[in-house]
Amino acid sequence: MAKKSKQARAREFNEKSRKEIYYRDCGGCIFCAKGYRMEKATWLDKEILSVMHYIPRSKNGLGIPQNGALGCQYHHNMLDNGNEGVRGEMLEIFKEYLKSCYKDWNEEELVYSKWKF
């Protein structure tokens, strides 16, 4: 198996970050906690949880707690695919949530840069 680049590793959530996010988010989806658009979600959709990127990996979003939150399969899919035209609204909720967790939260610090020191 080929070794991942420094950039690829920086964009993934490591075990420590995943645990920090899990405990910060009380083990549940941040959108479910708000009751956001739950009408089509099945019980299984809500049971399967994963860490979502605020700034996606495809846009060099870092795998750090300040760029992630716990999401159920239903909401994670809705956020990633924007299939209901609510991606912008969800990103605003996500952003406000992260800002409430980190007083010095700065969106510019969530993107991988080879030249940051």
Model features per residue range: what roles?
Residues 31-70, 84-87:
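Histidine-centered nuclease catalytic patch
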Residues 71-75:
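Zinc-coordinating Cys/His ligand positions in small cysteine/histidine-rich zinc-finger domains
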Residues 76, 84-91:
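Inner-leaflet juxtamembrane helices
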Residues 1-26, 33-48, 88-117:
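A boundary/linker detector
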Residues 80:
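Active-site hotspot residues in diverse enzymes, especially metal/ion-binding acidic/histidine motifs
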